[in-house]
């Protein structure tokens, strides 16, 4: 059990038998009336996001989530195989559980896998990943009909928007949460 004062991003709550992760929260103290907490909760199984409001000080049920360091090994059909960094046990995760993270996975990449009652819940990549541009069109100097970006395909097959000066073979820093371009990696 935890109070609303214990809320933090990433905390997993158990509500009506389902697991929900706090994505965002805000303590609100209005001029009139009692304080309350607005939260944005994400269902760890389905990915559905809902807004929920709690009165300040209310106790809620928390779930015990064990985050373990692992390394991505290879893809086996529709499964992604990871090796636990502590006991070297291999964990095959289905494509549905890996989700959008598959766009940024490289072999030997360190990740974290969250477990609840021995079964994997979700996968966490490092916030930034370094990937090489596999292909992109050359950016033309006078071509400014767009906002100064062009599509680029990364070595993992993911397609992101990059500035016009990026070329095939450049190593980029990419935000793994939303696939946004963060910068070039200096060689």
Curated annotation (Swiss-Prot):
Transmembrane region(s): none
Keywords, in A-Z order: Cytoplasm, Elongation factor, Protein biosynthesis
GO BP annotations, alphabetical order: peptide biosynthetic process
CDD domains named among the record's database cross-references: S1_EF-P_repeat_1, S1_EF-P_repeat_2
Domain of life: Bacteria
UniProt pathway annotation: Protein biosynthesis; polypeptide chain elongation
Location within or outside the cell: Cytoplasm
GO molecular function, one term: translation elongation factor activity
One GO CC term on file: cytoplasm
Pfam families: EFP, EFP_N, Elong-fact-P_C
Entry-linked PANTHER family: ELONGATION FACTOR P, ELONGATION FACTOR P (EF-P) FAMILY PROTEIN
Family: Belongs to the elongation factor P family.
HAMAP family on file: EF_P
Function text: Involved in peptide bond synthesis. Stimulates efficient translation and peptide-bond synthesis on native or reconstituted 70S ribosomes in vitro. Probably functions indirectly by altering the affinity of the ribosome for aminoacyl-tRNA, thus increasing their reactivity as acceptors for peptidyl transferase.
Protein name: Elongation factor P
Source organism per UniProt: Mycolicibacterium vanbaalenii (strain DSM 7251 / JCM 13017 / BCRC 16820 / KCTC 9966 / NRRL B-24157 / PYR-1) (Mycobacterium vanbaalenii)
């Amino acid at each position: 059990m935890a109070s609303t004062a214990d809320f933090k991003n990433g905390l997993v709550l158990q509500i009506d038998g389902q697991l929900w992760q706090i994505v965002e929260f805000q303590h609100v103290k209005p001029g009139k009336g009692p304080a309350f907490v607005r939260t944005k909760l994400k269902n760890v199984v389905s990915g559905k996001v809902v807004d929920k409001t709690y009165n300040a000080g209310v106790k809620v049920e928390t779930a015990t989530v064990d985050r373990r360091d692992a390394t991505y090994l290879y893809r086996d059909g529709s499964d992604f195989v990871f090796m636990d960094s502590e006991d070297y046990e291999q964990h095959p995760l289905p494509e549905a559980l890996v989700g959008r993270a598959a766009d940024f996975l490289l072999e030997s990449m360190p990740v974290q896998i969250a477990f609840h009652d021995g079964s994997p819940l979700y996968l966490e990549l490092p916030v930034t990943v370094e990937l090489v541009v596999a292909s992109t069109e050359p950016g033309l100097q006078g071509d400014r009909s767009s906002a100064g970006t062009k599509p680029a395909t990364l070595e993992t097959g993911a397609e992101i928007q990059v500035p016009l000066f990026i070329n095939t073979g450049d190593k980029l820093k990419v935000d793994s949460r939303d696939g946004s371009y963060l910068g070039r990696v200096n060689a």
